[in-house]
Amino acid sequence: MNGHFAAVGNGPTAQQYEHGIQVIDEDKAFNTNLNDYLGETRVAEAGFNYHLISVFGSQSTGKSTLLNHLFKTEFSVMSESARRQTTKGIWMSKNKRAGANGDAATMADNILVMDVEGTDGRERGEDQDFERKSALFALATSEVLIVNIWEHQIGLYQGANMGLLKTVFEVNLQLFLKDRQSQTRSLLFFVIRDHVGNTPLANLRDTLVQDLTKIWSTLSKPQGLEDSKIEDYFDFAFAALPHKILQPEKFLEEADKLSTRFTTGHRSAKDQEFVGGVFLPEYHRRIPADGLSVYAEGVWDQIVNNKDLDLPTQQELLAQFRCDEISREVFVGFDSVIVPLEEQQAEATRLGKATVLPDLGVTGAGTREKCVKAFETQASRYHKGVYSVKRGELESKIDARLKALYQTQLSAAHKSGVAAFSDAVTNAVKAGQKAGGYEFAEIVDKQKKKTLEFFKKEAQSLLIQGVAWTNFKPQYRLFEKELDEVSARLRKEEMRRLAIRVERWVKSRLGDSIGVEFNKLGSGRGGSGAPENGEKPATEKDLWDRIWNTFSGIIREAETRFADRAKSFEASPEEVEVGLWRLRRKSWVALREKIEEEMMESNILMKLRENFEDKFRYDEEGVPRIWRPTDDIEGIYTRARESTLGLIPLLARFRLAETYAPPDLPTFVGPQPAGAEPEDEEDLAPIGGVDEEEGKSLEEEMTVLSESKRQDLVVRFKKMADGVYVEAKRSAIGGITQVPLYFYIVLLIFGWNEIVMVLRNPMLFMLLLVMGGGTYVAYTLNLLGPMMQMANAASNQAVEIGKEKLRDFLENNQTMRQAIAMPPRSQDNGIGMDRLDSRGKKAQEVEEDDDI
């Protein structure tokens, strides 16, 4: 009994699949391997291009035999020696006539034939439950219901299977109540067996139609269907076959002809007989072949559990199942492409790198389209509503993954773009600095356009037509905004560098100008700060006025330079205002540092000494003083000292001579601009009188020397001045020789004769007069010391030369050299004038290296 088929519960083999499969066994168990069978027979991939036929009839009436001859199947047939049930349950096999004897051109593709267990069998007896359930199953799944009937049974009720047909009609109404919208039709194909030809086929047809109409009229119809006709739900077709035993050749011939009717047909109206094949489009249950097994299993589950069979619901459930299954299948391909990209991004994120994946947009869009199209190809055959929902879910699932991938890509492009922009601007600025000039605003504008184009290109490459979230305009605006922020930061840094350069320039100018002003302290009498061209020097009391005016002029020029250069950066007025405010503050601090440098203890003492010496050692015309005992050294010293001491209070505080008050520093610096940020104040030193909260007043800010330093400076200066005074006094007194008066009397008495002799001799008198005048001049000019040193050196040199000459004489005389055992003279013992010291002695020899 179909032992060569793949039965329920078995682990079927490919060879068993070649014959067919048991769909439902006699115990009402469904075969879950049906989908494998459809795959093995290549029906599953046919989509809607398949047809399902079921055969009904009484037991042992030759249903399986009929199918085997029509479709070349191998269903088991009853043994003629023992009339008993052969087909148990429902069996299925694929049409095998296709492709043989040229029949492939006349029969439809992928015809599946179900051999249903016969009715009215003694094995089941009164139990008609399986009969009803199998009829409902066949009607819910099949396009064509073949009713196998013998000619002599026509006109009978039980013999002609009228009871079975009534069951078919009843379950059809049951199905229709659940599916009024589609109103699926079915074909009842009556195959009249053992037709001998005495009764024309047309008469037999009329008899059957009358019987069917009568049965339909006796049915209890649902509300609203009372006037319905059988033709509203069923089409009828009729065929007759000769007796198989009595006319075997004729039977085979007619069976072959009948098989050709199982092809696609058509008709122009419902009331017209269809022409061509028996498979009309309205018969198809619109269940894709790859979902047929799931659909059939769901239908049978509802039937066997005595639940109301709701085909639309079953179709929806099938659609949900298959769409989910197809979605998982296509998502595997999606993962195979996307997961490696996600792993690359995850690795880059872990390493903290901004990695832009190449061709991500093309890959993502192509993979998405491929997956959606694959889903559409397979799933669009199912329930449209379910398909639409599941497609939306698939697209949402794909888009969620792609969105995360794309956003990470844009984030990486964002970061790398910002970094590239910053580096490009920085490098261009450095190159411009080396070249000697650059326009910061042009550099920023050029690099910004280039970077925006890069990001725009990357964002556009990720665009998917019809997908709203791939319109990355917000991300583009955010990127542009951050570039503006980076531009502002770079501009601020550039302005900081500009400020530093201007500050250096200010410090350099202040270093020269302020140093010159301090060098002018008391320099009107030929000191270190005396004017070169003899113009009248500036007064000491307006020192701070000159310093403030010089400082103000330098700052005005610096502000002009800063503002002009900042405008070329396209800096805002607020940024320029903040920069100028910082410049004024830092410039004032630089001035204070320069003043403190000039007012260091060693420097100020030197300035005071120079000031004092300028007044003490030089007269009003700048001529050096030669101190004589008759000079008023004490008076000059006192005036010079008091004048210099008067500088200390002047230098102690920064005050203008005109107002005798500090300069208006708060007005000069100005209030803090509204655009100043906390970081703009971090490197600024507090200024007294400006930053009141720092607790330092303007008076304290303008104090250069504290009271203790002033007192210490006065004491040290007085000690230094006293030393200069003592030195001057000593030089004046040191020129006087105290000779006793009696010495001149004794000299006159004892030297009278010599005096008379000199006076009487004009030549001697003139010589004495010249020598005396020369000595007086030498004494007056303090040249006696140097002259004595020169004379001493000359005498010493003469002695050395004499010794050398004597040595030469002894060395040249062989007899004398032998007598005193004198060694020969070396070649380098000569005496040169440059070998003698200031006293005429021979200087110590310094050996020289012959290699130099």
Curated annotation (Swiss-Prot):
Bias type Basic and acidic residues, positions: 834-845
Annotated spans, Disordered: 825-852
Q: What is its EC number?
A: 3.6.5.-
Q: Which residues lie on this side of the membrane: Cytoplasmic?
A: 1-738, 784-852
Q: Which PROSITE patterns match?
A: G_GB1_RHD3
The record describes its membrane topology as: Multi-pass membrane protein
Q: What class of enzyme is it?
A: hydrolase
Q: Which domain of life is it from?
A: Eukaryota
Descriptive protein name: Protein SEY1
Species this chain originates from: Chaetomium globosum (strain ATCC 6205 / CBS 148.51 / DSM 1962 / NBRC 6347 / NRRL 1970) (Soil fungus)
GO biological processes = endoplasmic reticulum membrane fusion
Residue ranges the record marks as coiled coil: 475-500
Primary role? Cooperates with the reticulon proteins and tubule-shaping DP1 family proteins to generate and maintain the structure of the tubular endoplasmic reticulum network. Has GTPase activity, which is required for its function in ER organization.
| Claim: Methyltransferase is one of the keywords in the record | no
Q: Which residue ranges does the entry give as Lumenal-facing topology?
A: 760-762
Q: Give a Gene Ontology cellular component term annotated to this protein.
A: endoplasmic reticulum membrane
Give the location in the cell: Endoplasmic reticulum membrane
Q: Which residues bind GTP?
A: G57, S58, Q59, S60, T61, G62, K63, S64
Which CDD domains does the annotation name?
GBP (cd01851)
Do the record's keywords include Methyltransferase?
Answer: no
Q: Which residues form the GB1/RHD3-type G domain?
A: 47-283
What high-level taxonomic lineage is stated for the organism?
Eukaryota, Fungi, Dikarya, Ascomycota, Pezizomycotina
